[in-house]
Amino acid sequence: MSTQVSASSLAQIPQPKNRPVANFHPNIWGDQFITYTPEDKVTRACKEEQIEDLKKEVKRKLTAAAVANPSQLLNFIDAVQRLGVAYHFEQEIEEALQHICNSFHDCNDMDGDLYNIALGFRLLRQQGYTISCDIFNKFTDERGRFKEALISDVRGMLGLYEAAHLRVHGEDILAKALAFTTTHLKAMVESLGYHLAEQVAHALNRPIRKGLERLEARWYISVYQDEAFHDKTLLELAKLDFNLVQSLHKEELSNLARWWKELDFATKLPFARDRLVEGYFWMHGVYFEPQYLRGRRILTKVIAMTSILDDIHDAYGTPEELKLFIEAIERWDINSINQLPEYMKLCYVALLDVYKEIEEEMEKEGNQYRVHYAKEVMKNQVRAYFAEAKWLHEEHVPAFEEYMRVALASSGYCLLATTSFVGMGEIATKEAFDWVTSDPKIMSSSNFITRLMDDIKSHKFEQKRGHVTSAVECYMKQYGVSEEQVYSEFQKQIENAWLDINQECLKPTAVSMPLLARLLNFTRTMDVIYKEQDSYTHVGKVMRDNIASVFINAVI
């Protein structure tokens, strides 16, 4: 199958007259990622050998901390995780936290120490252990309020704030803890010394639970090296590992950027967003580890194609053309291109090529069943795009519930979450695919967050250019409330959905933690990309800086 469509046919692509063209800004990166030259094999092998030696030393220190005292071990594990190198020590961390969990409530070493108790609670919850929140009762007064004396313990307050983000439904003490710590940390941040103020401000903007591992590691390396008692071996490992993984990511991105440039959609489909780099950043947030190279490549190609499909449906295609396109998608047959307009042929052929490539890879390993799931979620995605396009052209404003039924399918979450399993190893069994496509609670909650965060930040731009109504407009019309009231209500619903996610990540889990981590990480990417604005569509300073920090600038 070839992605080449006659260049002469491009002249037949309809001009933007009477089409809802969005005028997206062009790609801001040029060819800088294409021109990346990987370091030579000898240099890379030398760095890998250094890292292996440092890993052995850190592993030895983890073992030593485990036989020392719980506080020392918890702080070392926390540093390992926040510096982004925990993937090297998964078994050691699991064994250490299992041991701590068995005696956490009876541990005298941390009696009355808010910071270490909160740290232990957070680390155990992150690992999936159902540790009771009753451990915080000792920090409340007879009326159930947190003691005022805690306010002066800034590290303890910060630890409690982070721990509260791991709460589940019914844990009122942690809801109170979040309100208590947020209020007082905001009040004190400007009066703190620089080092502590930076940590507090960072946490208030994005707690650990909602941060992307690579972005957080990049930031925390600079914080950790300023700590008076940092571990030099661990810091050296974190820096070397970050830079080595960054070089692998740059090589991957270079190959993907070359593939994207050969398709030449920027020229041939100028109405669509050209966001290959941003898409790779998004997907690297789902799994950054070197062993998931194939998963990142597959996901990046799928999100790149999905972005084009999205723009065809709400930024260019006519109702008649879109009907032809959905029929072709349902058939999933290269011969269907004959009925399509020229610009759709380009997209359709490229889409089938991407899935053909996936299919060939899966066949080599006997995992071709995965392709069926991948194709079906893509078909569902396009069906949802088509339904929304019909609403737009019919000027239909659906009820909120009607809107959400379609919008949860069009958000892309189900498509990408399911596809993220395709590029993983044998851990992604057929049973895992059956589970992820059955809309389990963690999926529906994460998808809900994805849709609402997207709509909150993108609806104003979309309504200006002519776009299907968003959740915001549907809710305002149905309930007769203001835009600000909708935002407030949606934020409450988003936070409530996070409680569902936290609950679903506690043991015993429906599927293994590595699979759940993909779904959790997708939700985290939304907080990074959509918290301030739609940073995928409108690539501003925050997105540029984030991409530079993980793909361009090495750690020194």
UniProtKB/Swiss-Prot annotation:
Positions with a binding annotation for Mg(2+) 2: D310, D314
Binding site for Mg(2+) 1: D310, D314
Expression sites (tissue/organ): Expressed in flowers and anthers. Detected inside the pollen grains, but not in stems, leaves, tendrils, roots, seeds, pistils or caps.
Cofactor note: Binds 3 Mg(2+) ions per subunit.
Biased composition range(s): Polar residues: 1-12
Catalysis: reaction(s): (2E,6E)-farnesyl diphosphate = (+)-valencene + diphosphate; (2E,6E)-farnesyl diphosphate = (-)-7-epi-alpha-selinene + diphosphate
Pathway the protein contributes to: Secondary metabolite biosynthesis; terpenoid biosynthesis
Motif (DDXXD motif): 310-314
Enzyme Commission (EC) number: 4.2.3.73, 4.2.3.86
Subcellular location: Cytoplasm
Cofactor(s) this protein requires: Mg(2+)
Alphabetized UniProt keyword annotations: Cytoplasm, Lyase, Magnesium, Metal-binding
Cellular compartments per GO CC: cytoplasm
Function in brief: Involved in the biosynthesis of valencene, a major volatile emitted from flowers of grapevine. Can use farnesyl diphosphate as substrate, but not geranyl diphosphate or geranylgeranyl diphosphate. Produces mainly (+)-valencene and (-)-7-epi-alpha-selinene along with five minor products.
Domain writeup: The Asp-Asp-Xaa-Xaa-Asp/Glu (DDXXD/E) motif is important for the catalytic activity, presumably through binding to Mg(2+).
Family: Belongs to the terpene synthase family. Tpsa subfamily.
Protein name: Valencene synthase
Source species of the chain: Vitis vinifera
Gene responsible for this protein: ValCS
